[in-house]
């Protein structure tokens, strides 16, 4: 299975059966590689902010992929004429060989729309993805929360994708505490260095995590991938 970093919080997860993109912020993303074909079966969207909903509608129309998100955001996407699967936090669903479970995230969830400058779209979320005997946790945009301990206790996480940019999400110090609770085998930092406001040193984060835990940190540049 191949996990490719597309910049910011966007990832492409592929095996022989499934192609899945998470938070596909590609157009307008200064970090996004534009030479990687993104033709997903499924599109997971953690919340409606432009740097996460991103190109989801366009990709869904081009590929007939299904957008998976919280109920309100899925309904918003359905109004744009695409296939959706609505869920809510704590719920899980099998999509062929893949299971997806929605988790809590501490953030906002709105987008500009024809109903006004912003439309509230329910709660934001993270995702647990179970595919090919592996478990991947994409935290979405979130601050640190205590139930990360439960997520770690109830799952054997192979790879955790965690924001470290601070300001809009948890920063490196809180992300280290998240690693301690989640206990993943590997962590990939995300949601940093896209703009000056979320500038961070991922090497310092890697050093702190690997000194304090047994978790390995993989710093991926946009376009790089990890074989899981």
From Swiss-Prot:
Keywords, comma-separated and alphabetical: Hydrolase
Gene Ontology MF terms: hydrolase activity
Keyword Membrane: no
SMART domains cross-referenced by the UniProt entry: Lactamase_B
Coiled coil: none
Disulfide-bond pairs as recorded: none
Pfam families per the UniProt record, alphabetical: Lactamase_B_3 (PF13483)
Taxonomic superkingdom: Bacteria
Gene3D superfamilies: Ribonuclease Z/Hydroxyacylglutathione hydrolase-like
Family label: Belongs to the UPF0173 family.
Protein name: UPF0173 metal-dependent hydrolase Dred_1740
Source species: Desulforamulus reducens (strain ATCC BAA-1160 / DSM 100696 / MI-1) (Desulfotomaculum reducens)
């Amino acid at each position: 299975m191949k996990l490719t970093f597309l910049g910011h919080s966007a990832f492409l997860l592929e095996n022989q059966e499934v192609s899945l993109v998470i938070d596909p912020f590609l157009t307008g993303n200064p970090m996004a590689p534009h030479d990687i074909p993104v033709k997903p079966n499924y599109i997971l969207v953690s919340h409606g902010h432009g740097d996460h909903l991103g190109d989801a509608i366009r990709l869904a129309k081009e590929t007939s992929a299904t957008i998976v998100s919280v109920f309100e955001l899925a309904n918003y996407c359905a109004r744009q004429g695409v296939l959706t699967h609505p869920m809510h936090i704590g719920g899980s669903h099998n999509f062929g060989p893949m299971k997806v479970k929605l988790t809590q995230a501490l953030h906002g969830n709105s987008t500009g729309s024809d109903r006004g400058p912003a439309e509230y779209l329910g709660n934001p979320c993270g995702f647990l993805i179970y595919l090919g005997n592996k478990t991947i946790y994409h935290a979405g945009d979130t601050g640190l929360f205590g139930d990360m301990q439960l997520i770690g206790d109830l799952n054997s996480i192979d790879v955790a994708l965690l924001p470290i940019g601070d300001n809009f999400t948890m920063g490196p110090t809180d992300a280290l505490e998240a690693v301690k609770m989640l206990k993943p085998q590997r962590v990939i930092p995300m949601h940093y260095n896209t703009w000056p406001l979320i500038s961070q040193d991922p090497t310092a984060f890697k050093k702190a995590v690997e000194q304090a835990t047994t978790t390995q940190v993989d710093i991926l540049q946009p376009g790089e991938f990890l074989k899981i």
